[in-house]
């Protein structure tokens, strides 16, 4: 019996519930959820962050490190994480499998093609586009006039934001921000997946009537392409921590959470499940709590807020090129950003732990300053050194998170789905972001009226780099106005997607993309 078979046996996964993709990557059959339906779920730990630097806060690294700390303390723990998109891997941010000792393996495989889920999603997405265009070409029996559905690709390519063909104008979105990705992430089972695919709003006819995938009668073909992609992927982090890595919607331009199926499966397999929501608490956490959590077996027991001294200094006015230099004044000023995120967690009635992701460049003076700040403000505060030490560097943080997870809390939503859409948008903008007002374009107002009958959650697409809609406004912006440029409805995902000014769902590469830095030897190995 090899190491992985032994680890899978330890998880009490049966032989007919596991599918091998090589020696170190696996998928889990959906039948496992049915077998364990009567088992009580574990504790759910949600990891979020402050508004990050352009390179991120190390949320995935800390999540993995925290799980390693739980295991080091003898606890039964599992990770439930998003799978990476190739766009950022070759763009600015890089991979999304952690780093240092706190990393998923095989990291490069996971960062690229993994088990083929994103390829399957892209294929299903573009098959639907082809079916729509083909229907219009051969007679257009449905009288399709306006097509809402967009093509998708898992590459950052700004040239595809607007595409003109002989038949019609079209657009591409990155697969991670597509409705197809959101559907996979939110589906509870295969039956639910098919229902959601049928509910996709593809456009309207010449009389303005809504048209759906069900009208084209092609949902089963789309589901066929996704029949394996819906099964959660199992891999292991260093120190043999199990991780279900499945679905990867971005948090700035989508809802930013891994799949419901993976998280629910983890909750049945482990006593403690650590999951993350993309970017800061203003984006991923809010969407997790309003959009994903209602489909889970349990609610989050505690929220871990990841911060770095670098990001706090950035919010205190330091430029990114000078973040390695000690600066207590900027650090002190930047604390207003994390303080707002902690206030937001309280708005939801949840308890929090501040987790500092420690870097070698952090000075002792800065570390002591933060420790004193946390003590004075009676905060749960710990340090993660998972990157360099793995579980040994996070075991104290893990003990703190475990303790807080058992403290009483009473979750409450910021809005209910039944409320007016404009009211829901304002509640998020004013309460979570701190906006003084929200203004809507004429196009957005038209869409609000068009979809006023829908009782669905809100998914706001905005910059992750600021609490506001302007990435240049650092710290805790006040007296700003959030501008809404457009609104889209994703009825398969059951979301009202709200686009703030300047947001694109197809990113572009930066001026020096990471794609220029990869080097391989003659055997195809990374140098």
Swiss-Prot record:
Drop me one GO molecular function for this one. Answer: ATP binding
Q: What class of enzyme is it?
A: ligase
UniProt GO BP: tetrahydrofolate interconversion
Q: Which residues bind ATP?
A: 53-60
| Alphabetically ordered keywords of this record | ATP-binding, Ligase, Nucleotide-binding, One-carbon metabolism
Q: What is its EC number?
A: 6.3.4.3
Check the record and name the InterPro entries matching this protein: Formate_THF_ligase, P-loop_NTPase
Q: Which reaction does it catalyse?
A: (6S)-5,6,7,8-tetrahydrofolate + formate + ATP = (6R)-10-formyltetrahydrofolate + ADP + phosphate
Q: Does the keyword Cytoplasm apply?
A: no
Query: Which pathway or pathways does this protein act in?
Result: One-carbon metabolism; tetrahydrofolate interconversion
* NCBIfam families given in the database record: PRK13505.1
Family listed: Belongs to the formate--tetrahydrofolate ligase family.
Protein name according to UniProt: Formate--tetrahydrofolate ligase
Q: From which organism does this entry originate?
A: Acholeplasma laidlawii (strain PG-8A)
Q: What is the lineage of its organism?
A: Bacteria, Bacillati, Mycoplasmatota, Mollicutes, Acholeplasmatales
